[in-house]
Regions:
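Flexible, acidic/Gly-rich N-terminal and inter-domain linker regions that tether
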Residues: 1-70, 74-100
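Short Fe-S-cluster ligation motifs
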Residues: 89-119
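Conserved AdoMet/S-adenosylmethionine-binding subsite of the radical SAM
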Residues: 108-228
Length: 228
């Protein structure tokens, strides 16, 4: 089952580059800031990651099992019938897409030529652009390929698929879990599971699992006054 054509056109208008049937790449704001103004995101300060070397991507840019109230992205998931795109194809096509998206910066006098050339070969892959990446059944293979190509990986998940994280091999360089509610009532109100009434219970299992995962872990909060 491929991407909805209306959604695909909308994402492309928003400067997403669609990769395969469900993948996507979009240049991060901080990648642009690094090239144009030598500014870095928090990853630069905390982990020494150069923003111009970071590729923002997702293997399932159009698919998520939640419809969070704060999310500006458009959820478009009704089933779990996803195409398992070849991980090598996904990675190579994502890098090609990143290069195309950065091509215009090469002629900008504000962008140092050496830095722009360096950005053509991403060193860090942020699997966080859109959708829920743990829905991609070959995620472990994809992460493994990134690591074998000398790239670090940062995986952002809503934490509702603990079995995927438990079996994930290898683990990402850094794992981010969205923690947006203290209990089921608020979770259901804020995160709005689309078809899984046990999403909160699954999320709790992920929280219990985290101490056993041998990688850097970050709890990511989106706070809304008076709501969560």
């Amino acid at each position: 089952m491929g991407m909805d054509l209306a959604l695909k056109a909308k994402l492309q208008k928003q400067r997403y580059h669609i990769v395969g049937e469900h993948g996507g790449v979009k240049v991060c704001h901080w990648t642009k800031e690094s090239l144009l103004r030598d500014r870095q995101c928090y990853k630069g300060k905390f982990y020494g990651i150069a923003s111009h070397n970071c590729m923002q991507t997702s293997p399932v840019v159009d698919q998520c099992n939640l419809a969070c109230t704060y999310c500006w992205r458009e959820p478009h998931m009704d089933t779990l019938e996803l195409t398992d795109q070849d991980p090598l194809e996904l990675l190579y096509e994502s890098v090609r897409a990143q290069r195309r998206l950065l091509s215009g910066f090469g002629g900008n006098p504000k962008v140092p030529r050496e830095k722009w050339l360096d950005a053509q070969n991403p060193k860090h892959v942020a699997i966080s652009l859109n959708g829920e990446p743990t829905l991609y059944r070959r995620l472990g293979e994809y992460i493994d390929l990134c690591h074998k190509h000398g790239m670090t990986t940062m995986l952002v998940t809503n934490g509702t698929f603990p079995k995927v994280l438990e079996r994930l091999d290898p683990l990402p360089t850094q794992l981010y879990v969205s923690v947006d509610a203290p209990n089921k009532e608020i979770f259901d109100k804020v995160c709005k599971p689309k078809w899984n009434s046990r999403a909160w219970e699954q999320f709790e299992k992920t929280i219990d699992l985290l101490p056993s995962l041998d990688t850097r872990i970050v709890a990511r909060h989106t706070l809304m006054k008076g709501i969560n």
